[in-house]
Amino acid sequence: MIGIVSYGSYVPKFRIRVEEIARVWGEDAKKIKDGLGVHEKSVPGMDEDAATIAVEAAREAIRRAGINPEEIGAVFVGSESHPYAVKPTATIVGEALGVGNDYFAADLEFACKAGTAGMQICYSMVKAGMIKYGLAIGADTSQARPGDALEYAAAAGGAAFIIGENPIAEVEATYSFTSDTPDFWRRDLQPYPSHGGRFTGLPAYFRHVISAAKGLMEKYGYKVEDFDYAVFHMPNAKFPVRAAKMLGFSMEHISQGLVVKAIGNTYSGSSLLGLAATLDVAEPDERILLVSFGSGAGSDAFAIRVTDAIENYPREPKVWEKIERKAYVDYAIYLKHRRKIKA
C-alpha cells in the first residue's frame, strides 16, 4: 500500500483585502468579490519565497511523520516562482531539511499542477522500489501585473507530501489529461504572465479538470458516490464549485478544502493546500477525489483513501487554523513585500 505518509502546509501570515486593491484601481470591490468568490489573499513576507515556503511545509511533514530526513530518496519542488532561473529549488530544500546527499532532486514546472506531478513521480519511484520515501511539494509566490484581474487572487503558500508505504492515505489510482492549450503563459524575461481571459475557463480549466476526473472514474470504476470529499484546483472560488456541480458533487464535498476564499490562488500550492485541509478532518475509509489543473494545459486526478493510520497522526495545527492567523497590509506595503517598487 503506497500513498501519503505525512503532509505539511505553510500559509504566510500577511493578507490584503480585495477592497484595498480595488480602492487603488478605482474598481468595484463588491463586483470583484461576487465574481471571484475571493475576499482576501495571502501575501508573502519580504524574506519569503517559494523555497522558504517549501522548506516550512516540508519540515512540518517530516516532524509529523517522525522519520529521519535522510530516509527521503527524492525531493521534487513544483512552482511557477522558483527563486532562481538557473539553480534548483529542490537542492535548497533538501539541504535545509538535512536530507543528505544520496537523493534525487528536481524542480518541476507545469503552471499550477507541478506539485501533483511530483506526487505522481514519487508514487512511481516508491512503487518501483527505487526509494523509501519521496517528498513532493507545491509552493508559489505567484505574480500578477498591478491592475490586472489576476492581482485580486494571485497569492502565496504551499504544501508538502511525503509519499511511501504504510500511509495515512492510500493513493488508489491516478490519471492525467493533457493538451497544448495556450490559456496562460509568461515568456522569458517577462516579469508578469499573460492570460486568455475567458479562454481560461471552458477550453482550459473545465475541459481538463472534468476530463481528468471522468477519466479516473471511468478507468478505475469509481462513481461520485464513492467519494466523501472532492478537491479541485482553485484559481478562484467559482471555478471549483462549478466543476463540482458538473461532476455531480455537492458543496458538502468541497467546502472543507475550499481555501481559496480566504487566501486566494496559491498556484502550485492550491489543490495541495485543499487536500491538506481535507486530510485535517478526514476519517478512516473516507475517500477523496483530488484534481489539479495547470495552464498549458493539464490535470492530474487522484483517488485517495484514508487509512486507519490517520487516527494516531498529529494533524495540529490544521490548515484553517493557520489561515486564521493573519495580519493585514495596505497596498503600499503589499507592493513593497512583492518587490514591485524599485529603488
UniProtKB/Swiss-Prot annotation:
InterPro entries: ACP_syn_III_C, HMG_CoA_Synthase, Thiolase-like
Matches recorded under SUPFAM superfamilies: Thiolase-like
Pathway: Metabolic intermediate biosynthesis; (R)-mevalonate biosynthesis; (R)-mevalonate from acetyl-CoA: step 2/3
Biological process per Gene Ontology, one example term: farnesyl diphosphate biosynthetic process, mevalonate pathway
Any GO MF annotation of the entry: hydroxymethylglutaryl-CoA synthase activity
Catalytic activity: acetoacetyl-CoA + acetyl-CoA + H2O = (3S)-3-hydroxy-3-methylglutaryl-CoA + CoA + H(+)
Binding site for CoA: 198, 238
EC class name: transferase
UniProt keywords, alphabetically: Acyltransferase, Isoprene biosynthesis, Transferase
EC number(s) on file: 2.3.3.10
Listed CDD domains: init_cond_enzymes (cd00827)
Binding of (3S)-3-hydroxy-3-methylglutaryl-CoA, residues: 28-29, 112, 200, 233, 242, 265, 295
NCBIfam families assigned to the protein according to its UniProt record, in alphabetical order: HMG_CoA_syn_Arc, PRK04262.1
Subunit structure: Interacts with acetoacetyl-CoA thiolase that catalyzes the precedent step in the pathway and with a DUF35 protein. The acetoacetyl-CoA thiolase/HMG-CoA synthase complex channels the intermediate via a fused CoA-binding site, which allows for efficient coupling of the endergonic thiolase reaction with the exergonic HMGCS reaction.
Family that this chain belongs to: Belongs to the thiolase-like superfamily. Archaeal HMG-CoA synthase family.
Protein name: Hydroxymethylglutaryl-CoA synthase
Organism: Archaeoglobus fulgidus (strain ATCC 49558 / DSM 4304 / JCM 9628 / NBRC 100126 / VC-16)
